[in-house]
Regions:
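HAD-like aspartate-dependent phosphatase fold
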Residues: 1-169
Length: 169
């Protein structure tokens, strides 16, 4: 009904592990119909931000479970649990924590402490509600990195401006 009245509807979400089509399908399964253009995710915000603010050298991608994370003219490397690969990265982006564990946490912390580099965090949530539980989200783990000596990251999702600027455009 809102659309019939000329009201623009947007979903602004911190979901970054998957691409927009997965979020659209998830909303559709709940009876909520949105087009890809009506969904603005923190993954979208990260892609736009990094397209205009490309870090030098390869970007290590952490927490991606959806389609490949790509930025034009930037080497994006899906990281595995191999510390030597971490050392080859010039910066990192954390998309989500679905598969995160203490090994990932320790490798990222040690890599950033040994060689400080930019860390971009697409999803700045600490926890997220689900039907029967709460999930632990990237900001929870990042807070432990900071407490243990890692530099502050670049936050790209809600409540930070990048995602809202994207939604308003």
């Amino acid at each position: 009904k809102a659309r019939d009245m000329g009201i623009t509807l947007l979903v602004v979400t911190n979901g970054a592990s998957n691409d927009t089509s997965k979020k659209r399908d998830q909303l559709s399964s709940l009876g909520l119909e949105f087009s890809n253009d009506e969904i603005i995710s923190s993954r979208d915000a990260a892609e736009v931000f990094l397209s205009f603010n490309k870090p030098e050298g390869p970007l290590g991608v952490l927490g991606n479970i959806g389609n490949k994370f790509t930025i034009p003219d930037l080497e994006c490397v899906e990281l595995e649990q191999d510390y030597s690969i971490f050392e080859e990265m010039s910066s990192f982006i954390l998309l989500g924590t679905t598969m995160w564990d203490t090994m990932w946490q320790d490798m990222l912390l040690n890599s950033l402490k040994d060689n400080p580099r930019p860390l971009f965090v697409a999803n700045p949530d600490i926890v997220a509600p689900h039907e029967n539980k709460f999930s632990i989200e990237p900001a929870y783990f990042i807070s432990h990195l900071i407490a243990n000596g890692a530099h502050l990251p670049f936050w790209l999702g809600k409540p930070f401006p990048t995602i809202f600027e994207l939604a308003l455009n």
